[in-house]
Structure formats: structure tokens, C-alpha cells
Design a protein with these regions (language model features):
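Sequence/structural signature of small/polar-enriched beta-strand/turn repeats
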Residues: 1-166, 172-257
Length: 257
């Protein structure tokens, strides 16, 4: 359990050499797991980048991973928060990072979460971005599990995948989610993947690049505007209030006897 109202900090420091201020250090990587409670109470937990006297050389945000007593190792909350520092440095998911499957993600306060080339992040719950997200070549974001998830904010993904029939994925209104290389959204017969707006009746925006490989099958989509990109070609899919979506049935095999 955590008690009190203090602050746990893993903030980066500002470097000084020979009286001159160096760029701020990156925030640390912290994790807190509760074994007897489901609330972190009033305790603040930070991993901000170090500050620099000038406007552009603050350090990158670190990360904080929070788990309550009932959450498994990959069910916690990943927070990437830079405390309003300058947004010029990235918090990288690189090949050196372990534990890239999480429950939910929050990116905020001038943080910039970057998934490096050929790296991946798997998220079972919500993805909330009010700061910045960078996807390098061939990086992958996967939405896992069957519980309802929401994607808040605008993003440009390299590869974006959800293959969980029965799952509902909601998207925020007024934000665009772009996909550059792979868009894979699939449910299964009798158990479609549901794509919805966070605000029913209001459009969420999808932008598929012309070079993106699309696999969209057994989906139920509502309130989606794909006109920012190329048309979405979907098999075995139903939809309402959609724009730039093309619905088709799977091919039928004729047997001659």
C-alpha cells in the first residue's frame, strides 16, 4: 500500500560543466506494484526529463508503470509524462526495452513516445495521447484482449493491428489516426470486431496511406470517416454512417458436380 501525499521522483537532472548548463537528462524508468490495494491514493509519481535554462534542451520524459493488486504483469498503466518540459526529446521503445505489453497508455504534458524501427507495443486497454507519438519504420502497435478499449488523440502508425473478435475499439472525435504500412482489423464469423466513436453519431477519422496493406474482415464499423486517406476495403463487414469504406462479401467457391 501507499500512504500519505508525497512524491516519488525519478526525474532527470540538469547537467553542469565548468559553470555552463548542459542539456537535461532523461527521466528514469519507474514501476510501482501494489500488493494489497487498488489505489495509489494521493502519492504522485514522476519521471520527468531534466530542465535546461534555455527553451529547447530539456530531457526526455521517463516512464512510470503502475499496477494494482489485481493486475497481471501486462495489465498495468504506462504513463509517459514530461511535466510540461520542452517536447524536443523522445522516450524510446527500443530493442533494449523489455515489458512492452501493457494494459493502458497515457502520453501527456509534452512527452513524445517513440516506437523505434521494428519494435512493438501491445496494449490491452486505452491509449490516450495528448502530447506526441512517433512511429519509426516498421514499428507495430497492437490492441489486444477482448475488453473495450479507446484510442484518444491523433497518431500516425506504421503498423496498426487488432485481431480480437468481440472487442470494441472506440476512437476520439476530431483526431486522425493514420496508418502507413499495415492496417489489420479482423474479427471472426459470428464475432465481429466493433469499431466505434467515443461520441456516438460523431465521426472519427481514419487515414490509410496508399501504400498500406489492408486486411479488414468481420468488422462492424460505425461513424467512421476514412476520406482523409484511401478507401478502406472490408470483407464480411457491416457499417453505418461511414465514408470512404467499401464493403464486400468474401468470394464464393462454386463446386460443379
Amino acid at each position: 500500500n501507499l500512504a500519505g501525499s508525497g512524491c516519488i521522483r525519478a526525474n532527470g537532472g540538469a547537467g553542469y560543466w565548468d559553470g555552463f548548463a548542459g542539456p537535461g537528462g532523461g527521466g528514469g524508468r519507474g514501476a510501482v506494484t501494489l500488493t494489497g490495494a487498488d489505489s495509489f491514493g494521493s502519492v504522485a509519481i514522476q519521471a520527468y526529463g531534466g530542465e535546461y535554462p534555455g527553451p529547447t534542451y530539456d530531457g526526455a520524459a521517463g516512464s512510470v508503470y503502475l499496477r494494482t493488486q489485481g493486475q497481471g504483469a501486462s495489465e498495468g498503466l504506462l504513463v509517459v509524462d514530461n511535466g510540461g518540459r520542452s517536447p524536443n526529446r523522445t522516450t524510446d521503445i527500443s530493442s533494449n526495452v523489455t515489458g512492452t505489453a501493457v494494459g493502458s497508455v497515457i502520453i501527456r504534458n509534452n512527452a513524445n513516445l517513440q516506437v523505434n524501427s521494428n519494435q512493438s507495443v501491445t496494449v490491452g486497454g486505452n491509449w490516450s495521447n495528448t502530447a506526441a507519438f512517433t512511429a519509426l519504420s516498421n514499428s507495430l502497435v497492437t490492441l489486444s484482449g477482448t475488453g473495450t478499449a479507446a484510442v484518444f488523440g491523433s497518431h500516425t502508425f506504421e503498423r496498426f493491428v487488432c485481431t480480437n473478435g468481440g472487442k470494441t475499439v472506440q476512437f476520439s472525435v476530431g483526431h486522425t489516426n493514420g496508418v502507413m504500412k499495415v492496417l489489420k482489423l479482423t474479427g471472426e464469423s459470428g464475432n465481429r470486431l466493433l469499431l466505434r466513436s467515443v461520441s456516438p453519431g460523431q465521426l472519427w477519422l481514419l487515414k490509410a496511406d496508399a501504400d498500406a496493406v489492408q486486411t479488414v474482415d468481420w468488422v462492424d464499423v460505425q461513424d467512421s470517416d476514412a476520406r482523409p486517406g484511401v478507401a478502406i476495403s472490408a470483407l464480411n463487414t457491416v457499417g453505418s454512417n461511414t465514408y470512404n469504406w467499401s464493403f464486400a462479401a468474401a468470394g464464393v467457391t462454386n463446386a460443379w458436380v
